Amino acid sequence: MIIRVGSRASRLALIQAQAVVQKINDLLGLNAIIIPIKTTGDLIQNKNLYDIGGKGLFLKEIEYALLNNTIDIAVHSLKDVPAYLPDGLQLAAVLERGNVGDMLVSKIANKITDLPLGARVGTSSVRRRIQLLRLRPDLNIVLFRGNVDTRWNKIFNNEVDATVLAAAGLQRLNYDTSRFCNIISQDEMLPAIGQGVIAIEARKDDKLIMPLCAKINHQLTWQLIQVERGYLKTLNADCNVPIGGLANYIGNNNFEAKFMLGDYNMRYFFYSEVCGKLQHGYDIGVEAAKNFQKKLFV
């Protein structure tokens, strides 16, 4: 049996797909092949994601292939997976979470607070934008699309003074993060929902593939992302809504989580911390979102 693994065609996406293939080989003793698929999100690089349909554009063509049975599973960065999936598809497994943090990449500063007045910071993420401007309202936020390699090169071509990139992506691409890269404190910038997690999507009714996915699923990571995705689904937020969140395991079946919700125009910013038992994680994430909604509609 050969399992067909659908993936975006970017270098990072293919590395992540290969990590899934390796798990399939090592844990299941099965062969798998990667089928690269160009997505709309990859092809349109000169516009903000929220102007052209959101992060779901990185999944659309891959999910179409999944629904049409030309691939058996799809591999995504979980942070790109919307709150709700197409009918007939579901998240089937996740690998163990990588580095969850964001990194400031800059030749001239080690911290956001060290950037010069009016510094140009490249990002297309509204989550990063609002958190940067909360710390430094003087910053000049510049639209910054492209894959990790493209954005990295823009720094060293002096197109901007700094950018913010996911640490997990840089590490998976084997970038030397010992120079020009510094982790941003979670007190300054909460990550995206699901950041650092490689996710596997499959057909709900696939009685062969779903049990196989369960065998490579990292259970603790799965439980923690239920907290985060409960929050995401309740808000039903897309990429034009600045939201972030992270659940961490603290032992004895307990977790703690931090959430933020902002407004693109900086009219409000909500932050909360919650904790509880893993088995109640999804419901606690839902409740955190509802508490923010109550504040919005007071």
Curated annotation (Swiss-Prot):
EC number(s) reported in the record: 2.5.1.61
Modified residues (S-(dipyrrolylmethanemethyl)cysteine): C239
Cofactor(s) required, per the database record: dipyrromethane
Cofactor note: Binds 1 dipyrromethane group covalently.
Pathways involved: Porphyrin-containing compound metabolism; protoporphyrin-IX biosynthesis; coproporphyrinogen-III from 5-aminolevulinate: step 2/4
GO BP of this protein: protoporphyrinogen IX biosynthetic process
Pfam families on file: Porphobil_deam (PF01379), Porphobil_deamC (PF03900)
Alphabetical UniProt keywords: Porphyrin biosynthesis, Transferase
Catalytic class of the enzyme: transferase
Assigned GO CC terms: cytoplasm
Molecular function (Gene Ontology), one example: hydroxymethylbilane synthase activity
Catalytic activity: 4 porphobilinogen + H2O = hydroxymethylbilane + 4 NH4(+)
SUPFAM superfamilies reported for this sequence: Periplasmic binding protein-like II, Porphobilinogen deaminase (hydroxymethylbilane synthase), C-terminal domain
InterPro entries: HemC (IPR000860), Porphobilin_deaminase_N (IPR022417), Porphobilinogen_deaminase_C (IPR022418), Porphobilinogen_deaminase_C_sf (IPR036803)
Subunit note: Monomer.
Function field: Tetrapolymerization of the monopyrrole PBG into the hydroxymethylbilane pre-uroporphyrinogen in several discrete steps.
Note: The porphobilinogen subunits are added to the dipyrromethane group.
PANTHER family cross-referenced by the UniProt entry: PORPHOBILINOGEN DEAMINASE
Recorded family membership: Belongs to the HMBS family.
Protein name per the record: Porphobilinogen deaminase
